[in-house]
Each structure stands twice: as structure tokens, then as C-alpha cells.
Amino acid sequence: MSFSRALLWARLPAGRQAGHRAAICSALRPHFGPFPGVLGQVSVLATASSSASGGSKIPNTSLFVPLTVKPQGPSADGDVGAELTRPLDKNEVKKVLDKFYKRKEIQKLGADYGLDARLFHQAFISFRNYIMQSHSLDVDIHIVLNDICFGAAHADDLFPFFLRHAKQIFPVLDCKDDLRKISDLRIPPNWYPDARAMQRKIIFHSGPTNSGKTYHAIQKYFSAKSGVYCGPLKLLAHEIFEKSNAAGVPCDLVTGEERVTVQPNGKQASHVSCTVEMCSVTTPYEVAVIDEIQMIRDPARGWAWTRALLGLCAEEVHLCGEPAAIDLVMELMYTTGEEVEVRDYKRLTPISVLDHALESLDNLRPGDCIVCFSKNDIYSVSRQIEIRGLESAVIYGSLPPGTKLAQAKKFNDPNDPCKILVATDAIGMGLNLSIRRIIFYSLIKPSINEKGERELEPITTSQALQIAGRAGRFSSRFKEGEVTTMNHEDLSLLKEILKRPVDPIRAAGLHPTAEQIEMFAYHLPDATLSNLIDIFVDFSQVDGQYFVCNMDDFKFSAELIQHIPLSLRVRYVFCTAPINKKQPFVCSSLLQFARQYSRNEPLTFAWLRRYIKWPLLPPKNIKDLMDLEAVHDVLDLYLWLSYRFMDMFPDASLIRDLQKELDGIIQDGVHNITKLIKMSETHKLLNLEGFPSGSQSRLSGTLKSQARRTRGTKALGSKATEPPSPDAGELSLASRLVQQGLLTPDMLKQLEKEWMTQQTEHNKEKTESGTHPKGTRRKKKEPDSD
């Protein structure tokens, strides 16, 4: 039937018109495409629904962000649907749509197509708005709505149109099976065909710290024709790089921020020392060494060890680490058809847990290392040591590598008056330190769980062994190591922790690749990168030997730069840049770098100098020192990006020289850290008054087990506190929280404002009701209850 003939059919009276609707749809199909809304379609859809649902894993539909479908404006051809039938009565249409929404059969049918209650509701709201707000509708849906209004069709006939609209706003509904295939992570060994094409020999060097396990693996590395060392830290990669070249084995260095080739012609050496994330899984080697293999369980970085273990193309792969990783490694290698040879090592020097705690900083001896788990504890301990006329070195995680090495050298030098080290668990690996006695200032380490909540937990056995093992190392002048705690009540818990067996590692980390995310983006082109990651993790399938690593830092960066126009691959690279999201200046720098990149404006040396306001002054207080550390991290970020986008970050060598100069400024600041602490106290930038020579709040007695998983300020409710000293009479709970690093002064001010507001509201309620607020009554009763 021709188009003009179809129009003639549309002039028929309403009754005859409805009777011939199927014929009209058939006539118009060549002109307007298929009509999904013919009568009887619902039953057909119901029959096909079982195949449409696909897959057995129920997705988390809260991750599906609906797209916006704009209502249709006036058409240049006019309202063809109205010409074929008649204009629609919006009130009648609304009644039809409401009836459609309430139909249980329709809701059930929607569920068969992946529309749970939440998606169904969102899709209907969008569908209704589209229908009601459009100036003209497509011919097919206009005709169906007209017939329903006149009783010639059923409301169920709207379902095909509704489903089509739902797939427009939720495109994931149309490609769930494809997304499941892309995110199928159940056979990671198949991702590395080059490694699978060779028969590798896996040798596991198992033992505690200071057992010589890494030494034996490195000797094999030195004697090989070619090799790669994969370490967890830049410091370790640098150490092997220097040792290898000193031994006459030419070795290159590859880290995220640095590339060093030793051959005069720039040719790659046969050996390379790198951080584990930077190892090549396509270059063939004779020997590969993967250090600290137990970090394969790390929630954030475990994927890098998994990738190295499964993907390195080496005839021999030497693994160094804790015995807890042996079973998992053997299981993983069973899936690749490779056998594992285990070589056990014993500690080379004895280590003992003392029966007495330090109790007071007056009892410090040369070679002592006090391990703290917060910067505020480091500052306070350093200040107390300085008051006693002693000199201490300071090492914590956010210090630049050069500063850490300088402080380690100062502490190790027998001719230097510095005989005490105050450090965080950053000393657990990567530094050679001559420590006689490890003193745990606290056994409670703040951490962030998978929900982003702050937790206070005792350190694990693995962490305790790693830190305690730094005492009395074979290569140091102290051949016997000792371990104790600052407070006596912590000593029994430390002994208990050290005696516990280390839990075997159950699973290895995985991470989506850029290629997998790109394939996701192909199917979901309008989704944000953060949303793509959420959907990928939700759809991903892993077996019991693997887990998907925590992607929170990646998502944080993705959301930070979401509004910057970048290609997906470039955006992905920016999001993998290692930044400390607790540093506002570093985060804003990532944003600024991305913005400059999007404008195609190279980030030159001159531009960066202006951005960081170079030259920088030496620090006058702790805040200045922390600001300099943040600037150092920004320069690290520039160097990291310079190896990914050389044309846009062209001045890496100049920036590296600038960073070395900054490192020197920071070293001088840390060398005089007690002076900075004094200045901070003077200007009330750091409140350490009344701080006793022990920890402020400790787990003790039976409360220890109860407080192993506490959150926020609730942790203090499960702790027993020491009686305050006479000098600390004014020491409040808020002060203790600040000193322990659980609150910043700014956070405390905000809380004080909120408390004042709440108190004002309570007083107002009291005045209006004539009754005492509950909080006020309790406060009055407290003295009587003691």
C-alpha cells in the first residue's frame, strides 16, 4: 500500500479505523520502520523473555545511571500520527500510562528483561515524561495510544515501546551478555600467551625477614645472561640497580617516575631493576625475581604481583616472600602447568621479645627504633626525645626517598650523634637500618576499610613480624635483635600477636585493563569512567583464587577529572597516576594537569615553576614541611606523566633537577624537625602540650579483642585510657583524638560548631517544652553515678 493510500485509510471513522489498525501499520511499515505494538505482542514477548534475561548473576542495578531522552519537539512534517488518527487527549493518555504502570503482569515481564523494581520505576517516569512532553510522537506509538484510548487495544500493547525506551536510557540492558564476557576474569593465565608458550621454572624462596632469601635470588639474577628484578618500592628498585652495576652487571632502572639506562649508546642493558607495576610481560629473560610475593594479597596493588607471576617471560622465576603465600602460588601455578620448588630459609640472627616494656623515654639506648602509626605520635616522641638531650632520626611514608635515605644514613653512621630512630611502619621494607631494638609505641594502626570507614585495629601478625624483623639484621652492627612495647599493658598483646600463625593467603588480586574498559565504553558510550569501573567490578566473574582489587583511588581520580574533555585512553592513564588523595594540592594538581592537557597546552618547566611558586622557602613549622612534601609529590606526578605523554610534559630532566633541590630543602627541614615542632606549638599549629611519655590511649585487658574492629570516635569507647598525669589535667578527649591523628584541628573546629548548634537547639526545645533535654539530665546525674 502506498503512503497516500495509507493516509486515505486513516480518514475512516474511528470504529472502522480501529478495525483496520493492523492494515495501516502494515502499510506504513516501509515508511516508518517496524511497529512493535501490534496486538498479541505481549504474549510473544513473554515467551521470549527467558532467553532475554541472560546470565545467572544478578547485577547491582543501582549502578545503572539513566540517560536523558529529550521529548520530541515540533516535526517539520507535522504530526503524522494525529493526521492518521486524531490528536491525543493528554488526560486520557495519562490514565492509560498509569494503568500500564500498575499492571502486575507488566512489572513481571519487565523483570524478565532485567528491569527490577528500581529500573522499572525510573524507566516508566522517563517514558511517561517523554510521552506527555513531546509535541508529536512517532506514528506507531501514537496509533497504539489512540486505539487504547478508544478501547480498541489493551494497555499491555505499550510494553514494546516502553521496553524500547528503557533500553535507550539503560543501554546496559541490551548488552549484558557482552559485558559479562568482557569482564570474565576467571582464567587470568590466558591473558599472557607469551608466558604460556614457554615452560618456566618457579622457585619460591620462603622465609622470615633477615633470612637471606632475597640475597640468594639476587645472586642468581646477577649470574644470569639477562634478568629482571621486580620490587615493591622505588627504594628497593634503586638498591638492586646500584648493587647490580657495582657488581659489574650492567643494569637499567625503570620506575613509574624514572628511567635510567647505563649503556653509553642508550641501548637497553640485559638486566633491569623495576617496580613491580613496571615490569614487561613480553620481554624474554633468563631469570626474573619477584620480591615480597606475599603482597599479591594487597587490596590495592595485589594485581601487579599477579600480573608478574603469571606473565613474566623468564626461564626461571624466583619468588621471595612469606611462607603464607606458598599454597596460593602452587595453586596458581597448577593452572599454568608449572611446578614450584620451595626453598626454606631460617633467620640469620636471633630475635627475642623482651619481658619488660620501655615504660619511659628515659630508658632509650643507642640503636633503638620507636615505631609509631601516626605522624602526630612521631612529632610528639621526637619532641620528648629532644627535651631529654638526645638526637633522633625520623622516617615516615610521605617523605621523599632521598630524605628517607639521608635519615637512614644518619642513624646508621656510628660516628653520628644520632642514635635513636622514630619511624612509622615505612621501615618495614626498602631500607637497610642498623637497629638493635624495636619499640612499638602502639599496637593500634588506623586503616580504611572497603566501605571507606576509618578503623582502629591491632596490627596483624604479618605486619608485626615484618616490623620486628628489622631488629638485629645480619648486615648491621647489632647481631641480636630485641622487640618490646612502650607500655607494659601492650606487651602481652604483642607476644600474642607474634605467636599467632600467619593466615595463609587465599586469593590474588586482579585489575581491569585499559582494553577491557575501552570495550565496556564501546557498549556504554555515555557512561562516566567511574561508572564504567563500578559496572565492570559488579559484572566481573572471578574464581576462588582471585579477587578484584579495590578501585577507590582510581574512581576518585576519575570523578575528579570527569568534567575535563579527554579521550577514554588518556583519561584512564590520568586515573592510574599514583596520587595521595589526602593531599588537596596534589589532587588539584592532577586536575590542573588534565585541564592543560585537554587544551593541548604543554606543561613546560617555566609553567610548573609558576604553578608551584618556585623558589620555595625552607620550612618554618610542621605545616610548611607538609606543604613541601605535597609539592614533591606534585613533581613526582609530573615525572610519572612525562613518560606517558612526553610531548605534553616535555621538561622531565629539568623537573628532576628541581625535585632534587626540593629534596634537599625537605632534608634540612627533617633534620631540624624538633625546631619545626617547637614553632608549630608556639603558633598553635600543632598541639602537643601535656603529652605524656606513653601512648595516650591503649588497648588493655579484655578490651583488646573487643576493639579490633571499631570505627571513628567509637573506638575510644572500647579503650582503657591511662590516668592523666598532673601536667595533663586539661587533656580532653578531643585533644587525644587530635594527637592520635584521628582528627585534624580544622575537623575539631567544625565539630565544635556543630556541638554549639546542637546545644542551642536543645536549649530552645527546653524553653519551649519546659522540660530538660535528655543530654542535660544525664550530665547532672554523672557525678552521682561515680
Curated annotation (Swiss-Prot):
Give any Gene Ontology cellular component.
nucleus
Task: Please report the name of this protein according to its UniProt entry.
Answer: ATP-dependent RNA helicase SUPV3L1, mitochondrial
Origin species, per record, is Homo sapiens
* InterPro entries given in the database record: DEXQc_SUV3, Helicase_C-like, P-loop_NTPase, RNA-DNA_Helicase, SUV3_C, Suv3_C_1, Suv3_DEXQc, Suv3_N
**Transit peptide location on this chain:** 1-22
Q: Taxonomy-wise, where does this protein's organism fall, top ranks first? A: Eukaryota, Metazoa, Chordata, Craniata, Vertebrata
UniProt region (Disordered), positions on chain: 690-730, 749-786
Tissue specificity remark: Broadly expressed.
Give the domain of life. Answer: Eukaryota
Do the record's keywords include Hydrolase? yes
